[in-house]
Structure formats: structure tokens, C-alpha cells
Amino acid sequence: MQVISADQAAALIRDEWTITIAGFAQCCGPESILEAMERRFESTGHPRDLSLIFGSACGDSVSQGLNRLARPGLVKQGIGNQWTCAPRLGDLAADHAVRLETWPLSVIGGWYQSLAEGRSQVLSEAGLGTFIDPQAQDPVAASDPHRPQVMRQSGLDRPTLSYRSEPVRAALLRGTRSDPHGNITMEREVGLQDQLAQAQAVRSCGGVVIVQVLEITHHDALDPRAVHLPAHLVDYVVRADPTLHGQTYGVSYSPTLSGEWHGAAGFPSGPQQDGPSHSEGLDEVWRVITRRAALEVLEATQASDRRRPLLLHAGAGLPEQVPRELHQGHRYNDPRFIWTLESGVVGGMPIGGSSSGASADPTTFLQASVPLRRGGGRGVDMALLGFGAIDRQGRVDVAHPNEAFLGVGSLIDTAPQADRLVLLGTFSTGGHPRFVDRVTRLCLDAVRGASDERPLVITELGVFRLDRGELILIEVAPGVDVQADIVARSGCPIRTIDAPRPMPAQVFGHKAIDWPFVT
């Protein structure tokens, strides 16, 4: 192992390399190295034409993280699960300056593992029948025919998709401490992500592994149980500028996010608690949706007679706000349910906002792709996921036709395995209804692709049931005219029952709810 500066690390990256980068959503990546790469490109024009591999692109949604690499000429293409927090990459893709592919998160984790094992492909059912599938029968589902990396395999017991592996030349990772040999600990990190698999994949390809850390010790006294990346996988270590090594883009350091300290009194407060919206009106709309979703969690908890706690999955964005409503002002860890996140964090309270992907007081950290892999354990009891659009046949897209597409997130992985599926979203966006005649891309067929045959759809105007592809209004918000405000404004047919019940009164207003099951 060799200790180098961030500028030296940036100089190691050559033109046209394929590199994989750590970080997850608002959980920081190797920011010192990314900042040095940005400066080097500005001054020299190199490296050029990079190919990026990532899970959920790290970034602050403005200028940090992978947004730093979103420069014409610097990046040529990328494969990732989503780039919501690196919208500059999405802007380049919209301008056809960069080619971005989105894969299920479970596949990306398996992709790293296949490279580490010397295999040339990943076989997975994730993505079958969606727009990722090149042989999907539905034209809405058909993938880009110019993507040769995904093919359908039909000669096995059941159809699968083959995701082709390609050599990766460098991994840019991060940890907390390194000893003189390059053993890396992660005790102050907010998750493990897929960093071990990334390092193994690059090592198998003969590439270089560069790890940014906060501290380099001068003794061999690291606790072996704390070492996540062993020295034989690490080529270079960079001591980070502390201002470029925050835990998340909203929190420089909080021991509750890394699990070093437990207790609700230590929850971080401040900007990182902000929701994804920035207007007071939209915040109120989101509050109605998340509170109504919280009641679904309450109902499932009260109805459960299992000896083990319910396993709940909160997707990124709006669903991450639901736990805050449940726990606000109360004991935050009810023993009857456990939250999981796409980032691999299990337990505790998801923070969301500018700490999206992190939880306060987590129970454990898994690799990001592990909770979503099929066959690696049971599915979740309930998944709360965001949606962008739903059409007349019950097909779901993660983005509205008028919104930028920023990757599939966990919908493709999670919905087919969840016992109960709850979809959250505003009724409209920019004046356009989210219920449309035809989605742009099929991310989920609620009729055939969801484990829950009758998913719930929650908006601020009403609650709907998806039954055999038909949207049925079952609850309506106070003051809403069903015909004028919902049916007439919808872009697809909505069936209304004779007397839809009113949405619960407690989901409206600003008063904290005294959830009866929290004692």
C-alpha cells in the first residue's frame, strides 16, 4: 500500500478507463478524490471518456459527489441503479452527451461479484418483462435495442436476463481509518454499501483500488472485527481533507448514524432533516401522504400475529419520510417492525433529505445489494415505494413523462417480493396528473409483476386500490370533489365506489400524531 495525495490519485485515472465509485445517494463517497478529478479535468482536460459503474450515485443533488464528474468529455457512459442525487449526469444524458443505463440494484451487486469470480455475466430474473428486458412483448416495456449488455436467456428452467460483465480498471472507495499496511476500517461510516465487492472485482480485473480515509494510524492495533477492506485489496490510500469526508451531505459527523452511539436524544437535527421539497405547500402535501402511509404500517403492525418483527422497506425520497412521522416525539424503535433501506442499512430510523440512505441508531449494515437479492432471504412484509406515473393497465413508471428519468431505484427489485406494496406520490406534478393513459417505460406491471395483487396507491387527494390493473378510488380527502378534482383531471379511467370513505382526519394538520402502538 502507498499513501498518496488526492491529486496523485486523480492522476492515476487514465482516459477511457471504466471505474467504479463508492457512495450511496446522500451518503458521501470519496469526495476528496472526486474533487481532485474535477480540478484536474478543468486544468488539463483529462481524464476523458470515462465509463462509470455505481449503485445509487452519491451527491448532494447540486454540485458534489458524481455531479463533479458530469462534464462534457470527462464521462462517456455509465451504468447505475439511479442518479437522483447526481442530476447533472442526467442532464448530460438528456443532451445526449453521456449514455446512461439503469440496472436493478441487486444486479449491480451481483455484477461486482461476477467480476470478482472471473465470470463474464450475471444471470438474474430482476428486470424481466420491464423496459430493461430486450424481448419484452409490450412495446412500452421494450428496452433500447442498441444496448448489447443485456440479453434474455431462454435455455434455462425459466427465462432470465444476462447482464454482461466488463473489466473495471479502478475503484474509488472510502473508509474511516487505515493502518500502515492498508487495512481499512469503517467505524464512522453510515453504511458498507458494496465496497468490498467493488474492491474484489477490481482486484480480479488487475485494476487499482484507491481508498480515501479520514485517518492513517502508525501502528498495527486495528480491531480485526472493524476491518472491512483487508490490505491485500488496497493499492493506494488518500488522507482526506476532513471537509470533504462528511458522513452525509447533510451531516459532517453524528455517532448515531454510524451506530457508535445509541439513543433518540442523539438524533442529528438541522438541515439534513429537511424533506425533498422546498415549498411550504408541497411540504404539507407530502405530510398528508406520509401520514396516511404511516397508518398502513400501524394497521399491518396491529394485524400481525408473528413472533418476529415486520420487515418494512422504505424507498428513497418520499417513502423515507414515513418513519419520521411514525417516530416523531416518541420512542423511535418499536420492536414490532424493522426498517430497511436500499443502501443496506437495517434498523433504526431512516433520516431522508440530505442524509438519504442513512438511518439514526441502525441495527446493522449489509452490503447495499444484499437485502434486494432474490433467493437471498425472504421478501419484505411491506414495501413503501415512490411512483412517477401509473397508466390505465396498472403499469408503473418511476418517472412521469414530464419528469427527468433518474434511474429505477428499488422498485424492480422490491415490488415482486413484498407481501404488501404501498405506492406513494402526489396526484399531479407540474399540473400534469400522474395517472396517465400510457407510461413511458414499464418498471412494474402491477397485475403480473407484483407479489401483492392489490397494491395501495396513496396521494394527497385520495387513496386508490390497484385491482387487476384498474384504479379504484377507496378514500377521498376532505373538500375534494371526486368528479371535478380527481376523475376529470386524471389521464386514465378511475372507478369510484358508491361512497368512498373519507381519509382519516389525523393525517391532516400540523399536530404530531400520538400513534397508539408506540408505548
Give, region by region, the residue ranges found by the protein language model.
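Amphipathic repeat-derived elements
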Residues: 71, 289-299, 342, 351-352, ...
